[in-house]
From Swiss-Prot:
Pathway listed: Metabolic intermediate biosynthesis; chorismate biosynthesis; chorismate from D-erythrose 4-phosphate and phosphoenolpyruvate: step 6/7
Keywords of the record: Amino-acid biosynthesis, Aromatic amino acid biosynthesis, Cytoplasm, Transferase
Residues at which 3-phosphoshikimate binds: 23-24, 28, 167, 169, 317, 344
Pfam families noted in UniProt: EPSP_synthase
GO molecular function, one term: 3-phosphoshikimate 1-carboxyvinyltransferase activity
Binding partners and assembly: Monomer.
CDD domains the UniProt entry points to: EPSP_synthase
Record-given protein name: 3-phosphoshikimate 1-carboxyvinyltransferase
Catalytic activity of the protein: 3-phosphoshikimate + phosphoenolpyruvate = 5-O-(1-carboxyvinyl)-3-phosphoshikimate + phosphate
Binding site for phosphoenolpyruvate: 23, 95, 123, 169, 348, 390
Function field: Catalyzes the transfer of the enolpyruvyl moiety of phosphoenolpyruvate (PEP) to the 5-hydroxyl of shikimate-3-phosphate (S3P) to produce enolpyruvyl shikimate-3-phosphate and inorganic phosphate.
């Protein structure tokens, strides 16, 4: 990732769009469909770089994956017939691929090595390794904490585990490993995190029990898995950039269709409403993974908010662009209890503050979040995504508050989750002219 992009978009934005399929759900659907013997079709998947790394790894395990225009067809021999890979399993920039497959491959007992790019090599893996070791996984890393992760065969045991942080990746690694245990596993969450692993377990016929913050799997749950087709909703994390772009750009009026609004992911909608933003939902579907059309209009004079507690995991990936939105509030805003931001593609507390402060905004990082003061775009300094796709897109949205072009280094990082981001933003601008 090394190309720069000069952003020269001003709005207003008008029209109707859809955003790419949800990244979290695409990863998990690929994994579960690959475990199930037979054919599964995943419709409207995200075909960004992260999800391609997950696909590539299952191909190395013996799964046939065929890409079509708006779907992927997965023809699996079943987990019982996976082959041992004879090369390093490269996860690229994908923390989801790395952490979830650490659990899944430990459960499968397949000798393997997981390794990613330079960014992944800096991200700690101890939080996922700790519970897996309690489950008798044979897994080790560099300094017991970093990739590459070396996995060797072992017999996975069920555990009772109290989560120490609200992390869907850690939770999912435990649940995926537990599928292969002869004992039940009981997991209690710290705060409820995104539940796509649980909803997709049920979709692929894997028994799972959920009572409040407590989740339980049954012994050898993997034996129940069946191939299934799955339609991936639009990613609310991708929609977030258009939501904020419309809210801060005078004259904007947009609708984003078929966006996933799973309650464990829809924190940004609640935050925008608390700020007095003009946002409405329509065409709301029901089910484990509900969707809606999101209608957003420009809103001046936004209210100040404090974002904390269980609202944080429900908006964790959107917090950088929410921080940008908070610079346009009438008074100072606070984000707290967001330590999880430190172990994303970058330390997003520091990166968000550093990059926005370079542009003249006023953000103060804290040990667990940010204090964001009302402030304006004052400098067209060159900024850098730091190879973080969400930082890159957040900075592109920040440029809307300037009348001058903005140069963003390493902007190709956005291809991790949204390869067509800029063309879609320009499309809405063209409709607004």
């Amino acid at each position: 990732m090394n190309n720069s992009e000069i952003i020269n978009i001003n709005g207003p934005f008008k029209g109707e769009i859809e955003v790419p399929g949800d990244k979290s759900m695409t990863h998990r659907a690929i994994m579960l469909a690959s475990l199930a013997k037979g054919i599964s079709t995943i419709y409207e998947p995200l075909m960004g770089e992260d999800c391609r790394r997950t696909m590539d790894i299952f191909k190395l395990l013996g799964v046939t994956i065929e890409e079509q225009d708006n779907s992927i067809i997965i023809n699996s021999p079943g987990y019982q017939n996976f082959i041992t890979p004879h090369q390093v399993l490269y996860t690229g920039n994908s923390g989801t691929t790395t952490r979830l497959l650490a659990g899944l491959l430990s459960g499968l007992g397949i000798e393997s090595v997981l390794s990613g790019d330079v960014s992944i090599g800096k991200r700690p893996m101890d939080r996922v390794m700790k519970p897996l070791l309690k489950m008798n996984a044979n897994i080790s890393g560099i300094d017991n904490n970093y990739t590459p992760l070396i996995i060797k065969p072992s017999t996975i045991k069920g555990i009772n585990y109290q989560m120490e942080v609200a992390s869907a990746q850690v939770k999912s690694a435990i649940l995926l490993a537990s599928l292969f245990s002869k004992e039940a596993t009981t997991l209690t969450e710290f705060d409820v995190s995104r539940n796509h692993t649980e909803t997709l377990f049920a979709h692929f016929n894997i028994p799972i029990s959920i009572q409040g913050k407590t989740i339980q799997t049954i012994p050898y749950a993997i034996e129940h898995i069946q191939p299934r087709d799955f339609h991936v909703p639009g990613d609310i994390s991708s929609a977030a950039f258009f939501i904020v772009a419309a809210l801060i750009t005078p004259g904007s009026d947009i609708t984003i269709h078929n966006v996933g609004i799973n309650p464990t992911r829809s924190g940004i909608i609640d935050i925008v409403k608390q700020m007095g933003g003009n946002i409405e939902l329509s065409n709301v579907s029901k089910g484990a993974e509900p969707t809606a059309s999101i209608h957003v209009k420009y809103t001046p004079n936004l209210n100040a908010v404090t974002i904390k507690g269980d609202l944080v995991p429900r908006a964790i990936d959107e917090l950088p662009v929410i921080a940008l939105l908070c610079t346009q509030a009438s008074n100072s805003c606070i984000i707290k209890n967001a330590e999880e931001l430190k172990v994303k593609e970058t330390n997003r507390i520091d990166t968000t503050a550093d990059m926005l402060n370079l542009l003249g905004f006023n953000l103060q990082p804290t040990h667990d979040g940010l204090i964001i003061h009302p402030s304006e775009f004052r400098s067209n300094a060159t900024v850098d995504s730091q190879t973080d796709h969400r930082i890159g897109m957040m900075l592109a949205v920040a440029s809307l508050l300037s009348s001058e072009p903005l140069k963003i280094e390493q902007f190709d990082a956005v291809n991790v989750s949204f390869p067509g981001f800029l063309p879609k933003l320009k499309l809405l601008e063209n409709e607004g002219k």
